[in-house]
Every structure is written in C-alpha cells, then in structure tokens.
C-alpha cells in the first residue's frame, strides 16, 4: 500500500516553487504520493521576483527536485507561466505536457521566441527544442476529466475549465483517488471581456490555490474602459497627436484591436464626430510576436 502522508503532511499536498512572494515564476507541485507529483505551470521570473530555492530572473535553472514530477499541466501560455520549460527539460523532466487545444497551438510560438532570447539563437538548437516540445504536448478538451498515467499506484485525474484570461487559458481541477480535489486557478479573466467567454466556476474544491495578482483592486467595467480609450483617441485626433499603448502580445493586444475597431466603426457613422476624420487614425502594431498571434 502507498503511504498516506509525506514530509509535508497527508497526500495530496502542494509545494510552491514560484509566484509565492511575487507574481511571476508560477510553478506549483501537486504531490500525490512519495513517487508521483504533477507540476502546474513553470514560468519565468521577472524583475526582482525569486523562488523559494533562490531562482530568479538572473538564475533560471530549476532549483527543485524534478525526479517524481511525472506530468506538467499548463494553465495558459503567458511567459511567467511557461517560460522556464527549456530549463525544466534540462533538469531532466521527460513527462507529458497537458494544456488546452488553443494553448497547444500557441505554446511553440511563445517558447520559440523565449528560447531565442534567453537560451540560444542557433537554428539547430531551436529546432531541437521545438521538436522535443511538440512530441510531449497533449492537448485536452475543456470540461472533461483526463486520467494521468502515473507510477506509484495512485489514481489521479485533471480537468481543464475556462478561465477567461487569454485564448486557451484554463484553471485546473486535480482529483486524487476519485475524491479529493485541488483547484489551481492560473490567471483569471474578467466577466465582461470583449472577445472571450467569462471564466467558469469550480463545482467543488477541497483545496483552492488562487492567483492574487491585483490584490483587492476593483476593476472598472468594459464600458468605462472603452469610454476612456475613446476620449484619448478623440484628443489625439484633435491635437494630431499619438497614443502609445504598451500591451502583452497575447490577450491584451487582441482585446485592444477589437475595442479600437468598435470605436472606429461607431464614430465613422456618428454625426457627433463629423468634425473628426476617423479615417486619418492609423493603427500600428509594432510587435512581430503579437502580429503572429493575432
């Protein structure tokens, strides 16, 4: 029989290897037994954020034992959740990588860019890494339990549910022995996002590991955000000025383009803004990576 507890308490339990005292470097180990665990995300550290083992933006080598980690589940493909995969491979991880179908399509693009910037630009090494990555990717549908083929005689399943953060994002429900459920939220989106369905809610959870990137900040609604954006554009048109908007390549950029198109479409047909030439407002997306995603 498998022991019912380990050095940190009864199974299952969670070890946090990143995004503990900061918001980047997400890596959470769901420990199922002495022989088996599943890693949820393996992200890049940014700024001054560090992991409990000392890893940080200047030292991305994996600083935790990977010998019992038999699978990796990704919540979404932002770099602070997936950026350390090259170092995870180098540390000896050789298991499957589970994620949603859209994430499986986006992940090689994200990591090709990250690999060239952080590891090597040599075409042969980039191609070798991407081949290894794609061999291990296992796309999962939303809202279906998937059995994990783990050693150690313990039954474990995962289920992805929509998180509404970016295309392909999910929160992960992890179930041990058909009963105990641990939920990892990943990053959660807003209920009124313009191009994505709202996040689902978990049916039940014995343990909930939830992000708190924005703390207790109250976010304004979509209408208020769009009104502020439109006011900036009107001012730029009047002054013949420029609006510069920094945005993540995946998610924010596409939402901005959608909102800009909506504003332009409405105002081209509005008598209120006849004195403004909306056709004279060029929109320039200055990001090769964002262009590929879009």
Q: Residues of each region from the PLM?
A:
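Short, conserved secondary-structure transition motifs
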Residues: 251-252, 276-294
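His/Asp/Glu-rich metal-coordinating catalytic cores
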Residues: 6-73, 78-82, 87-255, 261-276
């Amino acid at each position: 029989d498998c022991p019912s507890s380990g050095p940190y308490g009864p199974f299952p339990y969670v070890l946090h290897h990143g995004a503990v005292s900061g918001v980047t470097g997400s890596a959470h180990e769901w420990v199922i037994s002495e022989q088996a665990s599943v890693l949820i995300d393996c992200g890049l550290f940014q700024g001054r954020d560090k992991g409990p083992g000392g890893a940080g933006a200047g030292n991305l080598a994996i600083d935790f034992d990977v010998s019992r980690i038999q699978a990796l589940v990704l919540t979404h493909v932002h770099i602070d959740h997936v950026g350390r995969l090259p170092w995870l491979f180098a540390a000896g991880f050789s298991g499957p990588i589970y994620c949603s179908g859209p994430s499986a399509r986006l992940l090689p693009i994200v990591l090709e860019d990250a690999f060239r910037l952080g590891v090597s630009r040599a075409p042969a090494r980039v191609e070798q890494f991407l081949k290894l990555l794609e061999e291990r990717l296992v796309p999962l549908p939303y809202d279906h339990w998937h059995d994990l083929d783990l050693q150690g005689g313990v039954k474990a399943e995962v289920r992805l549910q929509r998180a509404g953060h970016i295309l392909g994002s999910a929160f992960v429900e992890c179930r041990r022995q058909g009963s105990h459920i641990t939920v990892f939220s990943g990053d959660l989106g807003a209920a009124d996002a313009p191009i994505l369905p709202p996040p689902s809610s978990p049916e039940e959870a014995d343990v909930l590991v939830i992000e708190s990137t924005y703390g207790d900040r109250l976010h304004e609604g979509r209408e208020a955000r769009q009104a502020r954006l439109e006011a900036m554009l009107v001012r730029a048109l009047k002054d013949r000025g420029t609006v510069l908007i920094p945005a993540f390549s995946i998610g924010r950029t596409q939402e901005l383009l959608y909102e800009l198109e909506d504003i332009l479409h409405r105002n081209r047909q509005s008598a209120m803004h006849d004195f403004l030439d909306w056709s004279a407002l060029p929109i320039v997306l200055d990001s090769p990576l964002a262009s590929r995603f879009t």
